[in-house]
Amino acid sequence: EPSLYASLSVTPRLNATLTLNSDFADAVLDARVVNLSRFELFKPERRSFFTQDAGRFGFGGLEVEEPVLVPFFSRRIGLGSSIDGGLKLSGTAGPIDLGAFVVQVPGRSDAPVARMGVARAAIGLGESQRLGMIATQGTPDGLGRIQLAGMDHQFRSTRFMGERTFE
């Protein structure tokens, strides 16, 4: 099937991206790794639809490679099936950094399609603070209706006890 990947600048600082029948054939393959632990491996995202403006979806300053609670990890989307389509809006609107997208994947026999959505907004509070929120809906495999909402506050000072950095 033919696929489509299109990007449009809605404003100079806000972009919309559409993908249909995505096969991500241009994505670099991961090296094979044997995981003998009971914990999931967090490999970096390589698909362009998800890597473009990926920093806008970061939560609480957490790195995806760290085995901690990460509310959104795009590598799970489309693992067991293809992605039928996706729409993403990302950029800044005034002082607010924002990112939102919805992706549709083939579902099960009782639910022919499954959708997953993520929305994230953050605003800087001066030079050293940032306040944000995230909301997700759905599961990457379409097997449930799970919602998550969270808020985060980041504080960073480069003048903590002299010249040390405090986060």
Annotated model-derived regions:
Residues 2-167:
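Outer-membrane beta-barrel channel domains
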